[in-house]
Amino acid sequence: MSYADVNGLSLYYAEHGSGEPLVLLHGGFGSGEMFGPVLPALARNRRVIAVDLQGHGRTADVGRPLRYETMAGDIAALIGHLGLVRSDVMGVSLGAGVALRTVILHPEVVDRLVLVSVPCRRDGWFPEIGAAMRQFTPEHGEAMKRSPMYAAYARVAPRPEDWRVLHAKMGELLSLDYDWSADVAEITAPTMLAYADADSIRPMHMVEFFALLGGGLRDADWDGSSRPPGRLAVLPGTTHYDIFTAPALAAMVEEFLEAPAPGP
């Protein structure tokens, strides 16, 4: 087991494969183990670093709120701890929010970026999803102890009794309003957006997000010379809750990360 002491946190990470680095950031209430079905594909030619975020998986919680900005600082510090100058970063849902804030606040440590099932504004979620996020409380956590999600958490958490605290902190984080549109428009790292065709994100917002990255604004020309540096993928037959295990996603990510750098 590997831990990095960063920002007062003992941050757990697991490494797989060798090659150019790729940091993986899981979704809410999960851990790096969520990527298990696609890890062999992602690590075939790369050094994959699967992280457990604050209070998740094998990373114990500390006395600070959950905030995208502080978790982004943890990831930037981890990249430095590992002796890396830069790394590709891929996140899903909560982890994609952290990845997005990492490239915004610490652009010097991010090479290419893959964001899966995440909005850049809070109203990018379907309204009922945004409302449900406000229901994460200690009491909700207690009720969730009968779920497979809790079983996976309790199996690896340093302090399983922190499950209720995690729910309270997640509820607070996910209730905060945010709009990162102006920051997104300034991102220069090649970025791939990936969504399910039955996602928790509004389809119109997916297109708006892509446009902020310079995508979908014009035809790419017959030779593709005017295509944007970023990519947008919508995976058929997937949802917000299973897209990260789709073999098609792993194949798309691998191709995106290996593609020649876009021209000026």
Language-model region placement:
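Conserved HGGG/HGGXW glycine-rich cap/lid loop of the alpha/beta-hydrolase fold
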Residues: 9-60
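Active-site loop/oxyanion-hole signature of alpha/beta-hydrolase fold enzymes
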Residues: 49-90
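Active-site nucleophile elbow and catalytic-triad environment of alpha/beta-hydrolase enzymes
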Residues: 167-183
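Conserved alpha/beta-hydrolase "acid-adjacent" motif
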Residues: 200-208, 217
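Short beta-strand/loop motif that positions the catalytic acidic residue
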Residues: 187, 193-195
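Flexible "cap/lid" loop of the alpha/beta hydrolase fold
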Residues: 97-105, 110-150
